A protein has these predicted regions:
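Sec-dependent bacterial lipoprotein signal peptides
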Residues: 1-13
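Short, intrinsically disordered, charge-biased short linear motifs at domain edges
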Residues: 2, 28-29, 95-97
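Amphipathic/hydrophobic helical signal segments and adjacent flexible N-terminal regions
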Residues: 13-73, 117, 129-130, 140-177
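Contiguous, well-ordered beta-strand patches that form the walls/edges
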Residues: 70-139, 171-176
């Protein structure tokens, strides 16, 4: 009983929500009701307001186990009516494509706003568990502005249950349409 109480006491939960940066231009209303406006190529490294580190769009979309460190660009394309294709490219990196299915709920276009959803297992020296990521994409030329919601539930050191959520705003420069 003491061990169960200790485990419950050590279990953790964290929530972090970063508001939209006031210094950035406001996100305009979508110009069209469809999401073809997002088709194009974007820089993989972006901006997180107030931070010197440059976030990776590839890492947010594909996870920490993806080749995000070598990525230089991300291409969004509506190759079919029922999916969004995301292709990652970089020097010395074989292009990697992932298809987000609209029918499976991995992608959604709602009045000109595109949302991509990914669920993946994560494992590291410290933690293992299930991660859910929802990325809302907004066009604010010359940037792709993303609102990334992450939720993870798992165990730390294979013993301590942990759950956390975060929401952050990033922006990535459009390279070419």
């Amino acid at each position: 009983m003491k061990r169960l109480f200790l485990l419950a006491l050590l279990a953790g939960c964290s929530v972090a929500d970063t508001p939209y940066p006031i210094a950035w231009d406001p996100i305009p209303a979508p110009a069209a009701a469809d999401c073809r406006q997002f088709e194009g190529t974007y820089a993989d490294r972006g901006e997180l307001f107030g931070q010197t580190t440059r976030p990776s769009l590839t890492r947010e979309l594909f996870g920490a186990d993806s080749p995000w460190e070598k990525a230089s660009s991300v291409r969004l394309e509506f190759a079919a009516e029922d999916s969004v294709e995301v292709t990652v490219a970089g020097e010395g990196l074989k292009p990697e494509t992932r298809r987000f299915s609209i029918k499976a709920g991995e992608a959604r276009c709602d009045r000109g706003r595109l949302t991509l959803v990914a669920k993946r297992w994560v494992a590291s020296d410290i933690m293992s568990g299930r991660e859910s990521v929802k990325i809302e994409l907004n066009q604010s030329d010359p940037f792709l502005v993303t609102h990334v919601y992450e939720a993870i539930t798992g165990v730390m050191f294979l013993v301590v249950p942990l759950s956390g959520e975060s929401a952050r705003w990033y922006r990535f420069t459009r390279l070419k349409p």
